[in-house]
Amino acid sequence: MVWYWFTARKNGKHIRERIPADSQTEAVSELEKMGYTDIVITDIVITE
């Protein structure tokens, strides 16, 4: 599994979390659909 750690804003709050996705593009797209803005991918973690 690939986890993408990100920083973003949602409802005026600064957030740092992670999201599982197959690609960085998919991760950003999903975050945008959930209402996140100012998205920056900070780390990529691959787990088995």
PLM regions: where:
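DNA-recognition helix of helix-turn-helix
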Residues: 30
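Short aromatic-glycine-(Arg/Gly/Cys) micro-motifs in beta-strand/loop hairpins
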Residues: 1-14
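Residue-level signal for functionally critical sites in structured catalytic/ligand-binding pockets
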Residues: 8, 24, 46
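A short, exposed loop/beta-hairpin motif centered on an aromatic-Gly-Thr core
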Residues: 13-22
